[in-house]
Amino acid sequence: MTSSLPCGQTSLLLQMTERLALSDAHFRRISQLIYQRAGIVLADHKRDMVYNRLVRRLRSLGLTDFGHYLNLLESNQHSGEWQAFINSLTTNLTAFFREAHHFPLLADHARRRSGEYRVWSAAASTGEEPYSIAMTLADTLGTAPGRWKVFASDIDTEVLEKARSGIYRHEELKNLTPQQLQRYFMRGTGPHEGLVRVRQELANYVDFAPLNLLAKQYTVPGPFDAIFCRNVMIYFDQTTQQEILRRFVPLLKPDGLLFAGHSENFSHLERRFTLRGQTVYALSKD
């Protein structure tokens, strides 16, 4: 016995599985638009990634042509689809205590500072970085009110929602000590077995907000004792990198620290930052 789908369902299924054409001209337009909106440089070898991510947007909107999608974007500069476009093309690779050598340096720096110690996580992604910063500061400075604060931002609003929730799979916490896991997380039970959630006592010290590093103004509560901007500059060209670093300067306190990613080098881009350690820069006191 055989059965067949109704004609309309068959057409929809074909639409969902058929590979759409991404022309050179469309790829160039996509590259120009994401550069203008987010500063991200898309090399030619990213073409398949761009297709795989954006085709989901086309299909969710019932579109079968990249040209129609781009026309939809460009016809309304304030459309909510712009945020979905940006969210689709940002890369979010992160982990708790990634580049672990940074956190002892942060702790040592925090011990030697007076007043409220403030940190900005400028590419917070799904929250692992700002919560790692928060755990480090809680272990180092305690949790007395007004002792420290973390501000966390990202251009991708979807990952910020996950960050705010503070919910992770247990295996994502493999870099934490048993003491940190017990002190700062609650284990899920029943239908939430295998999940953990950041305890509210820690989450209260972390504020999340969307922020585009290309924005004309940074709505951040600076100045900060330290800024983490790790593994994001690699997606920008040198002109954009220099502009962002220039704008970081007034947002850092004298002798404040800037933490970079393992493949990033800022020494030649902004003379006011001097290398303090492995991918760690200090703002000159001058």
UniProtKB/Swiss-Prot annotation:
Its EC number is 2.1.1.80. It is an enzyme of class 2 (transferase). Methylation of the membrane-bound methyl-accepting chemotaxis proteins (MCP) to form gamma-glutamyl methyl ester residues in MCP. GO terms for cellular component: cytosol; methyl accepting chemotaxis protein complex; plasma membrane. The keyword S-adenosyl-L-methionine applies. Residues 15-286 form the CheR-type methyltransferase domain. GO terms for biological process: chemotaxis; protein methylation. It catalyses: L-glutamyl-[protein] + S-adenosyl-L-methionine = [protein]-L-glutamate 5-O-methyl ester + S-adenosyl-L-homocysteine. It comes from the Bacteria. S-adenosyl-L-methionine binds at residues 92, 94, 98, 129, 154, 212-213, 230-231. One of its GO terms (molecular function) is protein methyltransferase activity. This is Chemotaxis protein methyltransferase. InterPro entries: Bact_Chemotaxis_MeTrfase (IPR050903), Chemotaxis_MeTrfase_CheR (IPR026024), CheR_C (IPR022642), CheR_MeTrfase (IPR000780), CheR_N (IPR022641), CheR_N_sf (IPR036804), SAM-dependent_MTases_sf (IPR029063). Keywords: Chemotaxis, Methyltransferase, S-adenosyl-L-methionine, Transferase. PANTHER family: CHEMOTAXIS PROTEIN METHYLTRANSFERASE (PTHR24422:SF19). Gene3D superfamilies: Chemotaxis receptor methyltransferase CheR, N-terminal domain (1.10.155.10), Vaccinia Virus protein VP39 (3.40.50.150). Pfam families: CheR, CheR_N.
